[in-house]
């Protein structure tokens, strides 16, 4: 049971659909006035194989007025309150961009910029080639590979995903520079560069360290525990 909506919200001109696992009549309620602004009937969308449940759509796309709303089914079930508005994705964009800062490796995240998610500088040791490490080569060459972003929920840092992420961010800025002028509240904020470029630079400086003398690029920098 339950009524599932987009908790980020809906643009006024976008399609607006909630989903349920039961057929119903429904109303869209203005949460400020508690008045119904739309009445509708669910439509059967068939079986969702991944969920193993029958799914029904509650379409209220005709409602375009900005405001706070919730969906109320005829059986009394109601959704969380959500927003219809022009700027529903703005905070989501800022949150997504700030995620790159929280992935930073090799520097301390302080409460000024990270709030409760602080930690000391991590993974600051020099790197060695995996073969030298596994073979316990005496006095192997050491490399400064500090910096960059942690990748994929672990402590590895990989050139291929890094290049894709930085490339997409730079291309997004090239196409829509006006959309990336808001401060992300990172240590570099206020240095006359948009923070999307500041964050890309943090990763690019690490990527430069990963380039070998022959022009090639090492694939990844990771951590191995000897047990």
Q: Which residues make up each language-model segment?
A:
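Extracellular structured ligand-interaction cores
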Residues: 23, 55, 66-68, 79, ...
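Catalytic cores of eukaryotic secretory-pathway lumenal/extracellular enzymes that build
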Residues: 29-31, 43-46, 96, 169-176, ...
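Short capping/connector residues at structural and topological boundaries
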Residues: 13-15, 154, 176, 222
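Short S/T/G/P-enriched beta-strand
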Residues: 13, 90-93, 97-101
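Well-ordered alpha-helical scaffold segments within catalytic/enzyme domains
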Residues: 73, 166-187, 203-210
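Extended ligand-binding groove/face enriched in aromatic
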Residues: 99-161, 186-227
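Ligand-binding face of N-terminal immunoglobulin V-set domains in extracellular IgSF glycoproteins
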Residues: 2-87
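Acidic/aromatic-lined carbohydrate-recognition and catalytic surfaces
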Residues: 50, 78-94, 179-199, 209, ...
């Amino acid at each position: 049971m339950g009524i599932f909506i987009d908790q980020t919200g809906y643009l006024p001109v976008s399609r607006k659909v909630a989903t349920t696992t039961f057929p119903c009549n429904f109303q869209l309620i203005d949460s400020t006035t508690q008045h119904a602004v739309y009445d509708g009937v669910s439509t059967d969308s068939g079986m969702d194989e991944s969920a193993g449940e029958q799914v029904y759509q509650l379409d209220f796309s005709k409602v375009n007025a900005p405001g706070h709303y919730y969906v109320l089914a005829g059986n009394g079930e109601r959704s969380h309150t959500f927003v219809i508005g022009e700027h529903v994705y703005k905070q989501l964009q800022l949150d997504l961009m700030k995620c790159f800062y929280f992935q930073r490796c090799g520097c301390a995240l302080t409460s000024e910029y990270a709030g409760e998610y602080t930690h000391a500088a991590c993974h600051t040791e020099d790197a060695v080639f995996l073969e030298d490490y596994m073979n316990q080569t005496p006095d192997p060459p050491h490399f400064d590979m500090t910096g960059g972003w942690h990748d994929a929920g672990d402590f590895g840092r990989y050139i291929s995903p890094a290049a894709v992420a930085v490339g997409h961010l730079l291309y997004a800025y090239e196409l829509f520079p006006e959309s990336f002028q808001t401060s992300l509240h990172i240590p570099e904020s206020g240095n006359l560069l948009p923070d999307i470029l500041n964050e890309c630079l943090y990763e690019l400086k690490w990527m430069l360290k990963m380039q070998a003398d022959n022009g090639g690029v090492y694939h990844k920098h990771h951590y191995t525990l000897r047990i």
